[in-house]
Amino acid sequence: MNKNLKEAPNFNEADVQLREKIRKQGLSLGFDWVGFTSASKNLTHSSYLAWLEEGFAGEMNYLQKHAAQKTSSQNVLESAQTVISVACNYFHDDTPTLKFQDSSRGRFSRYSVGDDYHLVLKERLKEFRNWLLSEGLASGFEQTRVYVDTGPLLERELAWRAGFGWFGKHSNLIHPKLGSWLLLAEVLIDSKIPPDQPFSGIDCGSCTRCIEACPTGAIVSDRQVDARRCLSYLTIELKNTIPKQYRSKLQNWIFGCDICQEVCPWNRKAPKSSDSTWKARNGLRDRKLWDWVRLEQEEFSNQFRKSAVKRTKRRGLLRNVVTALSACSHPQALSGLLIGLRDEEELVRKHSAWALGFRRQRITKSILWRHLRVETTEQVIIEIQEALASKLKHSIKRERACLLTRQVSLALARKHRLGPSGGNHRRSSHNRRTKLLQD
């Protein structure tokens, strides 16, 4: 290792050339962007703590657990001097997102349709670290760390400080040329490498498309997201029941959500990745929602082997599927919910019952009544009862509306028979006849 490089407070041309050599190596390993920043105190830590204090993290308790460590990268590696921030573009033409406006098909976030990025990037980072060690750019293996999304680091700040781009109003980082379809990762080393300049000069301006497009209003303020409302959190991180006020907002998203990125103008010209790792797996593009409900555990494990989708487990994915079926207009949707209502998982049955109650088909009422007789789990029974109560309430409203419509129709018909002046027309005619007789 170059000891002078590690200890020097200033950098010379040779140091800059070394940085560019490292950057070139990172790009050759499959990263689409490589940047450098110092392992100093983080600038956004107080904002991060305030976000946690607001409860915006929902049930992601692991974020609170490591919050104190995130004040500085040196809390995870005391000897760290430099953070090498890297990013991979995962945007592919065949990703089933915007093409899947068809409500009968389940939609997955772009990042999840290929191989699990945690595994892919971790292998590339290890290769990068081995090269850095071979070049003497770290004192030893123990003086390095590699992280992909899971470490106690403020990844977006590190990437911003390393010159990546700016914080979009949806809170994702936006690169001026690559857009926001990128995955971040880091290598920490104990050598001082000249840092890149933090990004500046461009931001979102007056654009609010992501804020307006979010179906649940999860973007509560500029660059701040309430995860408890976010469809990605609700379909992935939340392990149990989805709050009722958000269920109908899922549309046909069954793993994650990309709406805020899809509407972003900076992603219109985002380059497409040539890396086949991120291509959609077979079976994701054409499978209908009601076919996903038939997914058994063995098939789930095979379909999503080394995939980020495994995070939800089968029960979580099927919970999302039956919830999405509530808004599917295809006749087969009902058959899918019937299967969901008989699933072994309480969570799936519970959301199937809600979805049947949400659908305005008369047959769903009798289906719920029949299942109520055989259901043994209290939470599912309560869900069925609430679904039936909702249907009764809707039925009463419908009957009242029909009665009101009938009354209006009768009134209009009566007015039509009596003429434009109604009953007064009949009385005035009688008065005219009486006057003629008197004359």
Feature names for model-found ranges:
Residues M1-D203, Q251, R370-E378:
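Auxiliary alpha/beta "docking" domains used to position bulky ligands
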Residues T434-K435:
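Short, intrinsically disordered C-terminal tails of secreted or membrane-associated proteins
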Residues S28-F31, R209-Y233, K239, W253-T277, ...:
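Iron-sulfur cluster-binding cysteine motifs and their immediate structural context
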Residues E299-Q303, H330-L341, Q361-R373, S395-R400, ...:
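Amphipathic alpha-helical scaffolding segments comprising HEAT/armadillo-like alpha-solenoid repeats
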Residues L318-S329, I339, R349-Q361, I381-H394:
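Structural detector for internal amphipathic alpha-helices that build alpha-solenoid repeat scaffolds
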Residues I174-F199, A227-Y246, Q297-S301:
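Short, charged low-complexity linear segments at domain edges
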Residues Y246-W278, E299-K310, G316-T323:
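C-terminal amphipathic alpha-helical segment
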Residues R314, E344-E345, T376-T377:
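Short inter-helical turns and helix N-cap capping residues of alpha-solenoid HEAT/ARM repeat scaffolds
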